[in-house]
């Protein structure tokens, strides 16, 4: 009888171990294909742009006033807390995100000057800096032009690539709204797997090709606040049906809203 019980326990332990290993394998496969794992990628690099570029972006007073209103309006702010443990497995970072997002639809509703700037003068500025003909992305997508707010201790987003759902190249521009140093920095890993940090202060903005740049926002310290304006641009707005579905799922997970 004791031998029988021992064998049943042993079989159960093997079953749990097999399930655990299967889950780990699935997570690694998902991470590899979704942008969670650091991998070697071939990318376009020239004198005009190579993975990222820093340049100053200045906002007019009427735009700053709109952003001040947005950042004070708690009703339109969506906090997303995605917590997984451990934070990394081997060379893959598990989905971890803590912070507030004000999505595009609220920017359109409450900040018309900002949207006009995003679609016109800012688009032209980024196009000149990168020497590319860029286009704004669809305003019905929640991350097209969004405000990112980190205000609680530990707010951050883990290492990841920005999956490119478009037929053309895909770029993200980050503009600092709070122009002072915090623990939350824009960080990326270079080809040598070294962590590099960029301080987004004093109007210093960064435009990067997130599909090829492995990056994160490091964790915020206590009694700090960081506000970033995130703007997305592409060389071709067309998107396949499958990628459109995948983008909807991603937006729902990270923003809590579905795009068009």
Give the ranges of each region predicted by the language model.
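Short, charged/polar surface micro-motifs in flexible loops or helix N-caps
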Residues: 124, 150-155, 178-182, 213
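Catalytic core of Fe(II)/2-oxoglutarate
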Residues: 180-260
């Amino acid at each position: 009888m004791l031998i029988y019980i021992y064998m049943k326990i042993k079989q159960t332990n093997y079953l749990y171990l097999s399930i655990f290993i299967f889950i780990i394998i699935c997570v690694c496969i998902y991470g590899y294909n979704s942008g969670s794992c650091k991998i070697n990628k071939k990318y376009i690099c020239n004198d005009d742009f190579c993975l990222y570029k820093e340049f100053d972006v200045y906002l007019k007073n009427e735009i700053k006033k709109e952003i001040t209103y947005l950042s004070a309006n708690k009703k339109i702010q969506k906090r997303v807390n995605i917590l997984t443990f451990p934070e990394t497995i081997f060379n893959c970072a598990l989905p971890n995100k803590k912070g507030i997002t004000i999505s595009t639809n609220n920017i359109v509703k409450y900040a018309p000057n900002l949207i006009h700037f995003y679609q016109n003068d800012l688009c032209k500025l980024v196009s000149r800096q990168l020497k590319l003909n860029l286009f704004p992305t669809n305003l019905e997508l929640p991350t097209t032009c969004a405000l990112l707010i980190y205000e609680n201790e530990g707010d951050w987003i883990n290492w990841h690539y920005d999956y490119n759902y478009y037929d053309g190249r895909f770029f993200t521009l980050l503009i600092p709204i709070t122009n002072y140093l915090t623990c939350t920095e824009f960080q990326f890993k270079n080809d040598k797997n070294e962590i590099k940090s960029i301080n987004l202060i004093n109007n210093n903005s960064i435009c990067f090709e997130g599909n090829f740049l492995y990056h994160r926002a490091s964790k915020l310290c206590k009694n700090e606040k960081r506000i970033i304006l995130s703007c997305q641009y592409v060389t071709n707005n067309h998107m396949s049906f499958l990628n459109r579905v995948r983008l909807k799922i991603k937006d729902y997970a990270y923003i809590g809203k579905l795009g068009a």
